């Protein structure tokens, strides 16, 4: 009954394991399965036959390493070679050659792909599993209508429904339905076979009338009737082979191919024994489905829950890559067939290598990784983000749902998600509940089901046995909830425990329990598992926290958290950002870019990542942790990566915080910080921006990279070398030239500027015919040039241009407007940076680093931050780090509070500071105003919290428009910083301005600064010359647009302008 047994306690599986297993499944048998489907190809005269011998295909080792593929913007892939034969039938001669099919992208050691130098990941998709599902719904008369929905492997749906008169219909389209007798006859069964293979033949005979008897009298009549209803054609169609082919292609192939998983599900649900290799819908399936539908009508059998995970399947990277490989082979088949026919027509002798080209496979995979919604650019903001992105599961994508049509029931948490899909970690917004994250112990089975581990409780064996169960199995067992299990087994056996059974929650005796959870974190994803005291937080805030941890910026000097959950080490290890020794040895050389080990008579060089840019512009860098002469063991950390310290994840800093209002500067989630965080580089981070330019071959000639740029100030060109490219280590400011480039153009005499013609006439100087198209540093890009790459592709044509990339590093301190957050959904914007002498200070004189608003806690119900804050203070004084598993109340009542207070009490005793733990108000302390030295009226909660700096920084957001583009239709300024857009003045902003009575500002915003074309053109001249800006004489463009749209609906809107002088009405045409 319970399979896949492993004895003993399990470790947490590697977080990229699901990706690795999926890719290995594709390489091991997905490739071979698709290659075996490749047909033998003959020419039109059937004299030449081409075939692939797929038993001995080969995948070559990659020609480049992963690091080089990223640096040179190449794809990390392997070449696929397959033996192919060309047989001449008249003489039975055969020519065999090994042909190159194409490149298959390989998964890297981190479970990701490198395509054109960009890290990409393929996320898992959750689809409705193919098979049959029964459900009921009320019609307009209040009567239950029972339907059975058959879902194909391609996602196509067919329905069987039974009406009030117990007649069974097959619905072929939304509006058309046909008798099940006709559809079964069209599939190849006669009336006698139908009646012999059903459980209730009398019901089938009851709705058989004379008209239906004629239709099912012959298969041709049944097919004609089926086609007429399916295609909605009138008249009397004539039976033909082309009609059969059209029906086969449009209906049966799309809606009747079940696949391996669908055949397995269909056999289980309908108690059939059809072989697994028979993957198409058979008449026997349809009749068995009709029998079950009749049983449902009369109260026999159970309806299906479509949202249960046993009725879902995971479409992993293996399935997606296999589908694309099959598509590429179909394209290759067409290419080979066309090439054979062309060679015969021109009387050429083909060879297997001449017939096969690598283009179909290469282009198919390039378009898949570039365009498919489930192939995404890897989010590399910090190490945690990389892990979580690979463990996402999505209901969206081809064959899935859309954000606008998905119902609340699909988005909601289901009991079958327990231990499989995290109930907390999902995206916010329109995709809430549709994009989730797999729980940390979840794994994907070979049939696409998500499995989770349990301990099986057996009377015969005293040892606990670990079993991985799919959702369809554990539903029928009593599963004890893991958050209520006591440590003492003897006490545990005497008590009643809460348990799950068939989607119900019960309280039963311990002897009746079949299974129990193995781990407190079992239900959560990686992001949620890093939140300490998560059980004390509202789920909405825990969701925000798990999302915001992925947005944390790696800091220049990271720090381990005082209060954690214990998974920080594994998160850092599985992210691959740290350099880890793969063997024992001795360090003989260390530098910033490499470490050299010696052992067993040879040396090994370990290259380190130096100032690598992530796709979110954060800095990925490795710092050496070992010194020369030190002996190293296998698995020891040699260098810390970004946001890791000592092999643990370190996303933020432990800072001293106080929860109190301060002059309104922390109103509505604003945060007050000390200047110490700025001057001591506590929250300083490095960001690397990439700027690139390409050189093309134009119709007038090639573009040139040069330092000699006419008509530009020498100051702007000061950082260029003799080739016209910015020098490494240069400090560049906004507007500086990074790459000098000239584009040739044809210049007519009339197009020259007057000064150009003067120079030519007097001095005889030949005016340049090239246009300056240099790469300039945009606004906000100032920094240090750390790398320049000149990528020259083979055969530099206009289709294959050269690319020059310049990487500039920026050092960013904390500023007003930056976003910070804790690990409990407590986020805020920095409102003011106070001098440290003005900050509130503790009784030992220590100034506070951050001041949070206490009103942010009660309404949000994220009390976990209070526990973390106080325990962090105790840990700071005692020099301890705490790793607290969630749901510690399963050991005793109020366990979290007791732990915090006992540690605070010990810290108070050891440091001889009674104010650390005061029994009257435990956790709080009297603190003083830094400006006056007076104590505040009330005791204030103080402590050490782990605060993150998020990627939402004011330098990337702040923007002002001086002039820019306008929308073509409305003639209003565009929106967004990237388009140099304007600020939107919405309805509520207009109300505020109206409330102040600022008529002129309102008029400017509605006319000159927005969409009054003539008036805004006059503003410039009036501003230069001086004088009064004239009032706009007619309606703005948006009003004219409204009038035109009403006219298109045959509604005439007249508008009039009232003269200020004589109050006469003047009609104006819109």
From Swiss-Prot:
It holds the Pfam family RNA_pol_Rpb2_1. DNA-dependent RNA polymerase catalyzes the transcription of DNA into RNA using the four ribonucleoside triphosphates as substrates. This is DNA-directed RNA polymerase subunit beta. Keywords: Chloroplast, DNA-directed RNA polymerase, Nucleotidyltransferase, Plastid, Transcription, Transferase. The keyword Transcription applies. Its EC number is 2.7.7.6. GO terms for molecular function: DNA binding; DNA-directed RNA polymerase activity; ribonucleoside binding. It comes from Piper cenocladum.
